[in-house]
């Protein structure tokens, strides 16, 4: 992990080589949000595996994997991890309006399906299957 004054517009990023870069000057990384950001970016190291597991569930239903779901999982999981340690913590996704900017359709399914998995109920496979059932989109019709 590298800490730098400037990273990018988001204040942090990760690459496919186990590199995490976090801005020390971004207001979104102050206090507990810095820890949440590190956790968030660290989770991106498994993007390919998570994407493939979700995609396989979508294939079983003959549907398309919904764009944005895997990033919603990352935001939600990182926020939940911090909230469990510090009750009352407002997750970064809520603080910066992530759910209002393109990931709105995932918040309720994540709360109803993914959070119970994080609480120890069910398996990841079952949670992914339910998330895809709730959020996947129909393939385009061939004309």
Q: What is the predicted role of each segment?
A:
Residues 7-10, 27-29, 52:
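Solvent-exposed loop/turn segments at secondary-structure junctions
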Residues 90-143:
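Pan-zinc metallopeptidase signature
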Residues 1-14:
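Auxiliary, metal-adjacent structural segments of Zn-dependent hydrolase domains
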Residues 50-51, 58-109:
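Post-HExxH zinc-binding segment in Zn-dependent metallohydrolases
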Residues 15-22, 46-60:
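Flexible internal linker/loop segments at domain or repeat junctions
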